[in-house]
C-alpha cells in the first residue's frame, strides 16, 4: 500500500514538474501581435532556434502575400530565423537574440516557458527590456 502511494506520488510529482519546465520552449507559437507563427526547434546544439512559419495574410499590406512578404532588409519573412544563440540558464534561456523583421533590428533576448504552455519572450537593449507573451499553437490532428 505504501509502495503504491509512493509510486503514485512520484508519478504525479514527475508529471507536474515536467509540465512546468521553463526550458521546454519547443513548439509553435502565435506572436503577441497575432500576425505570425514562430516554430521553435533545436538548433542542432541543444539550444532553441525560432523560424517564422506562417504569416496572417489579412495583416499584410495590400498586394503583399505571405510568400512575397519581405523584412525591412529585403529578406523573405517566411522561413526567417528570428530567435537564436541561446544558452540554458537555471530558470530560462538567455544570451540569445531576437530579430525584428519590420525594423531590421536584432535585440538581446530571453525565453521562458510559462506553466500554462505559453512563452515569455523578452527583447532587450542594455537594461531596458520589453516582454511579450506568445501563445502556443495547438496543432489540429484531425
Tell where the protein language model's regions lie, with residue ranges.
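Short, solvent-exposed mixed-charge patches
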Residues: 140-142
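Bacterial N-terminal signal peptides that target proteins for export
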Residues: 1-8
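C-terminal terminal-subdomain/extension
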Residues: 109-113, 117-119
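N-terminal signal peptide c-region/cleavage motif recognized by signal peptidases
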Residues: 15-17
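N-terminal helix-cap/turn-to-beta initiation motif at the start of protein domains
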Residues: 19-28
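Short polar/acidic secondary-structure junctions
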Residues: 43, 101, 112, 124-126
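Central antiparallel beta-sheet cores of small beta-barrel/beta-sandwich binding domains
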Residues: 26, 32-102, 106-107, 135
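Short, exposed beta-strand-loop hairpins at the edges of beta-sheets
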Residues: 119-131
Amino acid at each position: 500500500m505504501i509502495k503504491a502511494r509512493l509510486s503514485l506520488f512520484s508519478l504525479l510529482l514527475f508529471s507536474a514538474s515536467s509540465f512546468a519546465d521553463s526550458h521546454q520552449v519547443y513548439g509553435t507559437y502565435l506572436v503577441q501581435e497575432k500576425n505570425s507563427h514562430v516554430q521553435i526547434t533545436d538548433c542542432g546544439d541543444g539550444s532553441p532556434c525560432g523560424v517564422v512559419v506562417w504569416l496572417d495574410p489579412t495583416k499584410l499590406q495590400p498586394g503583399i502575400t505571405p510568400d512575397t512578404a519581405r523584412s525591412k532588409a529585403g529578406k523573405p519573412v517566411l522561413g526567417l530565423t528570428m530567435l537564436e544563440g541561446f544558452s540554458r540558464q537555471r530558470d530560462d534561456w538567455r544570451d540569445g537574440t531576437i530579430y525584428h523583421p519590420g525594423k531590421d533590428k536584432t535585440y538581446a533576448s530571453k525565453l521562458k516557458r510559462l506553466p500554462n504552455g505559453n512563452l515569455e519572450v523578452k527583447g532587450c537593449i542594455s537594461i531596458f527590456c520589453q516582454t511579450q507573451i506568445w501563445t502556443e499553437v495547438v496543432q489540429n490532428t484531425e
